[in-house]
Amino acid sequence: MTVIRKKHPLIKIINHSFIDLPAPSNISSWWNFGSLLGLCLIVQILTGLFLAMHYTSDTATAFSSVAHICRDVNYGWLIRYMHANGASMFFICLFLHVGRGVYYGSYNMIETWNMGIVLLFAVMATAFMGYVLPWGQMSFWGATVITNLLSAIPYIGTTLVEWIWGGFSVDKATLTRFFAFHFILPFIITALVLVHLLFLHETGSNNPTGLNSDADKIPFHPYYTVKDFLGVLILLMAFMILTLFFPDILGDPDNYTPANPLNTPPHIKPEWYFLFAYAILRSIPNKLGGVLALILSIVILAFMPLLHTSKQRALTFRPITQTMYWILVADLLVLTWIGGQPVEYPFIIIGQTASIAYFTIIVIFMPIAGMIENDIMDLD
């Protein structure tokens, strides 16, 4: 068996990735989220595949087909709610995974980090298009509002929007192409994940100290396979509690009303995992400025290696930057809350303040804190 594992052309790739992979001996549970994201992706692809067998991407029947899945298909309600809430679990793991990367300075592995940002954009695009498919009120108006943002692009904006819509409004052509893209993107994401892992295994994993751990490595199996399995059990338990007891808690009641182009919902808002970016978008009165801020709120992650001023990699031994980091986390929670509130006083000013704070902390305060900590170390 050992010979096959190490010599077979296909099996040895798996062996070098998940079995004999040298891993730091001190990585904590914050390193579990990579495998949990893999699990989420598998769950989403499988549940999505079964949903696609019964779903019809036509404006006349899309809403009814989702109702049919929930009422008439064996365990259709479970598959549908697992898929909807699986997206939420996916984003919870994603945000924690990115947050871990920022905290422990994993962005210094530039290829892995940049591929992660590409993955983040791909997952966000997939989730957005998936939200349109049930063809409820929030699906329709969410698609209208978000795609309309492209009209802010000078000169070609309006043409681009109509090209994406396949007409002069969000209609049958839009729904059909969104379904096609929503189906294909997870497989593209799977390929990107393999590239992400390829880059990671070129450098090896980071660890909580931020120091080089080449002198102290252990095999991935059995140590981290068992550790990851515990994470999997906890995630599945949380996931099934959410799906079976509170399936609609993260959804919008408006999406149980069929799409009606003649009736606008009182508050158009995306799913909870986009609210922080939506709040940044709304905080700028200018349309193009808002769109640029929205894109920059994610793209700014790519600049983190350039903004790293400290002599230390991780925040483990850097209390000043740690404080900045947790203020940033609190700020993102405020932005998420604001994104779900109506555009009126005092929410407008809170959103604008939180948006300014978001960019200021990353671009100004965290690099300055790093330099101050360098000076403190030099005093010793």
From Swiss-Prot:
Top-rank taxon, per record: Eukaryota
Cofactor(s) listed: heme
Family matches, as Pfam families: Cytochrom_B_C (PF00032), Cytochrome_B (PF00033)
GO MF annotation terms: metal ion binding; ubiquinol-cytochrome-c reductase activity
Binding site for heme b566: H97, H196
Cofactor binding description: Binds 2 heme groups non-covalently.
GO cellular component terms, A-Z: mitochondrial inner membrane; respiratory chain complex III
Record membrane topology: Multi-pass membrane protein
Membrane spanning residue stretches: 33-53, 77-98, 113-133, 178-198, 226-246, 288-308, 320-340, 347-367
GO biological process entries: mitochondrial electron transport, ubiquinol to cytochrome c
Miscellaneous remark of the record: Heme 1 (or BL or b562) is low-potential and absorbs at about 562 nm, and heme 2 (or BH or b566) is high-potential and absorbs at about 566 nm.
Protein name: Cytochrome b
